[in-house]
Amino acid sequence: MQSLLAIADPTRRRIVELLAVRERTAGELVKEFDMSAPAISQHLNVLREAGLVTTRAEGQSRIQTLNPAGLDDVDAWLEKTRSVWSHRLDALERELRAEDERNARKKKKSSS
């Protein structure tokens, strides 16, 4: 669940979104934000530790790449949560329909 904690931060979510489009250097990422290179580096470290980002050396540059498999635990959690809410919403819908039917019967009885 470390990846879910990592993307709880809006800056890290935005980094993930940017890397989903294409890989970038840390310098390119710094230009996207109003923060220092060390601050972006700290965010990248959190994303790397969570398995969301990989870094490779290319000459003098460090290329940051999104690791989609790092989002698997987030996807699994969302699926589980979605399933729970789907069941709850289905039960609520059934209860509301039953309530509507009861009210319609009461109204019909009182108007007879």
Locate each region found by the language model.
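Short helix-coil-helix linker/hinge
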Residues: 6-11
